């Protein structure tokens, strides 16, 4: 049954919140366990819908998956199946990350084109091109990515764009290829570094993680391991932006602030007081936020996943902000819902110009994806009256205990069955 959130605006948020493991990391780590026969253990798994969905994908490939709280125990078989069917894959985008491990381990893969968030075109061209350079035949056939290889051999691979997904799929195939693979213009996101750390624990030889050039020396086989997922920087930043919007005071634990330096700098520019430790940060906002300009870019730039929250912040800031989207072209669909809440915003190509108002007005709004949903809830926190946020299953895919955490911070929000 469909559910919605009812958010009553006007409360100042304060307190402490701890974030769990990163959604953008755990799903790739789960897929990587297919590379080694035996049982791998992943800890600090977030309580989000996409984790059991990925578990179903892996079970369909012959793995045994046990989810126990924040622990996932995954036993990969000696001969995994190579066909990830549409029923399991269609529900979320990250399911395509089994492509690289299957090509690496089975030398063949058939993965249905994935579903997921409606934030614009995210083609698999770079994934396919990279796998072809490693020696695989890779094409789209009947709605599936189909790859076959006699052997995989290392190659020099130049990515047109530092795509996270392409970097990860190429990486997970290259770790068991013959010879040396170099990925130029590789994605530098902390989630990619986390994957490299786990692969090296499994016996891979990956150098340069977190830099634009990654070197992978292939090994014959990998072994199972135990690994702890890094903290979710996107969830953590969402709480920091919530503090700034509500003129609140929130301490966020369980995340490395080094993964969020540009975001925290922007919050400082908006007038917040930001303090940091090795594994936490605190955002305190006393006055109305100041307008700031934001341009999304691959890491270490401002994350595209936080663009909706940046627009929500700009909508009540003092002044006019320009938000530029350089990653996903359709992410500005969110602006239409913000206008329903009274925001003074307009889009022009990949720019959104937002003139801040003292307060938004409540209205029914609809989530189109995980981050847009979170942005709408933050907007509801500063709107006059009760805002109804619909299609909140999107939010549940990326934010563990979202309502419970908001309530603990002083928000007035409830989940209602429609």
Swiss-Prot record:
Residues where phosphoenolpyruvate binds: 23-24
Family matches, as SUPFAM superfamilies: EPT/RTPC-like
InterPro entries: Enolpyruvate_Tfrase_dom (IPR001986), Enolpyruvate_Tfrase_sf (IPR036968), MurA_subfamily (IPR050068), RNA3'P_cycl/enolpyr_Trfase_a/b (IPR013792), UDP_GlcNAc_COvinyl_MurA (IPR005750)
Top enzyme class: transferase
Localisation per UniProt entry: Cytoplasm
One Pfam assignment: EPSP_synthase
Active site positions: 117 (proton donor)
Pathway annotation: Cell wall biogenesis; peptidoglycan biosynthesis
One BP annotation, GO: cell wall organization
Origin: domain of life: Bacteria
CDD domains (alphabetical): UdpNAET (cd01555)
Keyword vocabulary terms for this entry: Cell cycle, Cell division, Cell shape, Cell wall biogenesis/degradation, Cytoplasm, Isopeptide bond, Peptidoglycan synthesis, Transferase, Ubl conjugation
Reaction(s) catalysed by this chain's protein: phosphoenolpyruvate + UDP-N-acetyl-alpha-D-glucosamine = UDP-N-acetyl-3-O-(1-carboxyvinyl)-alpha-D-glucosamine + phosphate
Gene3D superfamilies named in the record: Enolpyruvate transferase domain
Binding residues for UDP-N-acetyl-alpha-D-glucosamine: 93, 305, 327
EC code: 2.5.1.7
Sequence position, cross-link Isoglutamyl lysine isopeptide (Lys-Gln) (interchain with Q-Cter in protein Pup): 81
Biological function: Cell wall formation. Adds enolpyruvyl to UDP-N-acetylglucosamine.
Protein name: UDP-N-acetylglucosamine 1-carboxyvinyltransferase
């Amino acid at each position: 049954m469909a559910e919605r959130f009812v958010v009553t605006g006007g409360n100042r948020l304060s307190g402490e919140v701890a974030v769990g493991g990163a959604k953008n990391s755990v799903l790739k780590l789960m897929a990587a366990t297919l590379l080694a026969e035996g049982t791998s253990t992943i800890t600090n798994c977030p309580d989000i819908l996409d984790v059991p969905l990925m578990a179903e994908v892996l079970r369909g490939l012959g793995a045994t998956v046990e989810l126990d709280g924040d622990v996932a125990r995954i036993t990969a078989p000696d001969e995994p199946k190579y066909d990830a069917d549409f029923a399991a894959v269609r529900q979320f985008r990250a399911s395509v990350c089994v492509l690289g491990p299957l090509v690496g381990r089975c030398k063949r893969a058939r993965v249905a084109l994935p579903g997921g968030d409606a934030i614009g075109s995210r083609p698999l061209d770079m994934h396919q091109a990279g796998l072809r350079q490693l020696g695989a035949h890779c094409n789209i056939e009947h709605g599936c990515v189909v790859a076959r290889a006699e052997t995989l051999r290392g190659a020099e691979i130049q990515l047109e764009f530092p795509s996270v997904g392409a970097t990860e799929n190429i990486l997970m195939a290259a770790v068991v290829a013959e010879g040396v693979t170099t990925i130029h213009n590789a994605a530098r996101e902390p989630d990619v570094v986390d994957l490299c750390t786990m692969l090296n624990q499994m016996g891979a030889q990956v150098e340069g993680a977190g830099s634009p050039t990654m070197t992978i020396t292939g090994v014959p086989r990998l072994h199972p391991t135990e690994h702890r997922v890094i903290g979710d920087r996107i969830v953590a930043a969402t709480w920091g932006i919530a503090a700034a919007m509500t003129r609140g005071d929130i301490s966020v634990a369980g995340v490395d602030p080094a993964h969020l330096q540009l975001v925290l700098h922007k919050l400082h520019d908006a007038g917040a007081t930001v303090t940091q430790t090795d594994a936490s940060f605190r955002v305190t906002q006393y006055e109305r936020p100041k307008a700031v300009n934001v341009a999304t870019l691959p890491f270490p730039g401002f994350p595209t996943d936080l663009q909706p929250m940046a627009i929500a912040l700009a909508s009540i800031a003092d002044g006019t902000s320009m938000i530029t989207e350089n990653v996903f072209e359709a992410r500005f669909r969110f602006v239409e819902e913000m206008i329903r809440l009274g925001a003074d915003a307009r889009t022009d190509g990949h720019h959104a110009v937002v003139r801040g108002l003292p307060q938004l007005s409540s209205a029914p709004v609809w989530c189109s994806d995980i981050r847009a949903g979170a942005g709408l809830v933050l907007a509801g926190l500063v709107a006059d009256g009760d805002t109804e946020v619909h299609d909140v299953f999107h939010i549940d895919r990326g934010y563990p205990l979202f309502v419970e955490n908001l309530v603990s911070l002083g928000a007035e929000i409830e989940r209602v069955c429609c």
